[in-house]
């Protein structure tokens, strides 16, 4: 049971056994992940690997990998992934050399729906000025000058570094005297998303 805005990893795998072979396949229905912020992890090339499922040997292909951040609490549904496959199966016929002739057929397979119960963030110990960050972060305020002359400018950078929902919250606004002329901050992000979630830094 994840918390609101806590990363969830979803991996769709296709299992099959000999003598069945998969010669072609494509997604005919991709999950939309409603109520989640989602990021698909790139799979450069589908490859078949050996695996064990319920004590039996199988071939397996990792078809889709996604990282999700729930944007609502309560019961949320992960939609299924549907694949259209071209399957090769040995027939009872044999070729000139005595090898079994493969027979092709088309099949559609669908992963089942999954429900996830998303918990509300704890209220106990929640800061008054909480701005939505969920994860493990370091927060720094960087000032480029230690002393100032009249009418001289200075720069403050707010920087958050770590692992968590970095792209899903705003940095806190500085409370400054009205006598200072304040310019709009330049926002920058250096964030990568892997199966373990977002990692990197953001700054204003």
Model-derived segments and spans:
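Surface-exposed interaction/ligand-binding surfaces
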Residues: 1-204
